Design a protein with these regions (language model features):
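Glycine-rich beta-alpha loop segments
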Residues: 19-154, 331-335, 358, 363
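Charged/polar low-complexity intrinsically disordered segments, enriched in acidic residues
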Residues: 34-42, 288-301
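Acidic/glycine-enriched connector segments
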Residues: 112-114, 135-196
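Short, acidic/small-residue loops that bind anionic groups at enzyme active sites
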Residues: 125, 149-160, 195-196, 209-236, ...
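Short acidic-hydrophobic, aromatic-tinged amphipathic segments that line or gate anion-handling sites
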Residues: 172-180, 257-267
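Active-site/ligand-binding-proximal alpha/beta "capping" segment
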Residues: 175-225
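Conserved thiamine diphosphate
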Residues: 183-194, 243-262
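N-terminal accessory interaction module
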Residues: 289-295, 302-363
């Protein structure tokens, strides 16, 4: 136990009681002052992290960091703090992020495709996250309705118009930096749909796939959506096959991180099929714990061990109860579980395993 339970707050003038983390300001007297301040506002559970946040700010000052660097750190932290607060009341709601061109016009078939998709996911009590601007972003908000939508906007010298459907809504956030904006998109979303767009859309597509491929984002369905007869993702996929996969820059298994479709039904099937059995995952003491509605029977577990032995670092895939850490956190203890020593490398293969757990064939 790290924190004293006798009290959770410290009054002004009281000596600090918290155990200091290893990361400090470098000045013992200043550390004590920071600790006393932190104990006045932070919960005992999170006091160490709040201490380190303050310590980082003070270390930047002691480093005599350039004012421009301080502005970046300051703005980024303020943007994240605000966004965390906006999303916090909706953490229990599943969300789909929708990316695409700001230049798509309301009479474009892609616009209608997007409104239909957003309406379909909202009808299943999901929310949508878009960039809050015109084009595909506005189509997503219009389809879902503003009550079911977030706007994660970026400040630009052009294409800055806010969608009429979310203007003035408290769920509209404005970001200065792309990196903090993309962090919120990926952190808060449970599924991703990308429609044709420009450099920004392709940037979002490649960064998202990179994060999934390297395990820096939670496994999630990714849909590359076009209209019937459209060639955008077809040509993009041909480029990936020819220029990335053929020379060995990406693996054939990486195709399983995404699905290309030209229908709303196909997109909906991919999103909700991903969560038809699988729920979530968590690492606990070196074990990857997969949570789901129902685990396979003994024969099914044996089949998983045979098919996915290449991503099991040691031991085997097995059915387990909720771990003590999950019980302590009340972390979906009602769900069934599989656990194994994941090699932390084969993330695309892990996605293939999730498909198996959902009873879905490879596409």
């Amino acid at each position: 136990r790290r924190w004293p339970r006798s009290r959770s707050r410290c009054s002004p003038g009281d000596p600090p009681t918290m155990k200091l983390p290893r990361y400090r300001t470098g000045d013992p007297a200043l550390d004590d002052e920071v600790a006393a301040l932190v104990e006045r506002v932070a919960t005992p559970t999170d006091a160490d992290l709040v201490f380190e946040l303050v310590a980082s700010s003070l270390r930047l000052a002691r480093d005599r960091a350039d004012r421009g660097d301080l502005k970046i750190a300051n703005a980024a932290l303020k943007e994240m703090r605000h966004a965390f607060g906006v999303f916090a009341p909706y953490r229990a709601a599943r969300k789909v992020a929708i990316f695409g061109s700001a230049r798509t016009q309301p009479d474009d078939p892609l616009y209608l495709q997007t409104t239909e998709l957003a309406a379909a996911v909202a009808a299943r009590d999901w929310m949508v996250v878009t960039g809050g601007g015109p084009g595909i972003m506005e189509a997503g908000i219009e389809g879902a309705g503003p009550d079911n939508a977030f706007g994660v906007s970026i400040q630009l010298p052009f294409e800055t118009a806010t969608s009429q459907f979310i203007a003035g809504d408290p769920k509209l956030m404005n970001f200065r930096y792309f990196f903090t904006r993309k962090l919120e998109f990926i952190k808060e979303s449970d599924a991703f749909v990308l429609l044709p767009g420009g450099y920004g859309t392709l940037d979002e597509a490649f960064e998202l796939l990179t994060l999934l491929q390297t395990g820096k984002a939670q496994p999630a369905p990714v849909v590359l959506l076009d209209v019937p007869g459209g060639t955008y993702w077809e040509h993009w996929g041909a480029f990936v096959d020819r220029e990335l996969e053929l020379p060995g820059y990406v693996s054939p298994e990486d195709h399983h991180l995404m699905r290309v479709t030209d229908t709303v039904d196909g997109a909906v099937d991919e999103i909700f099929g991903f969560y038809s059995n699988y729920h979530s995952q968590r690492f606990v003491e070196g074990w990857l714990v997969l949570r789901m509605q129902q685990t396979p029977d003994a024969a099914g577990v044996a089949a998983l061990n045979e098919e996915f032995a290449d991503i099991v670092a040691r031991d085997a895939i097995e059915v387990i109860d909720a771990t003590p850490a999950e019980v302590a956190d009340d972390d979906h203890v009602e769900l069934a579980r599989l656990a194994f020593r994941f090699d932390r490398h084969g993330w695309s293969r892990l996605r293939m395993m999730i498909n198996r757990l959902n009873g879905r064939s490879e596409q």
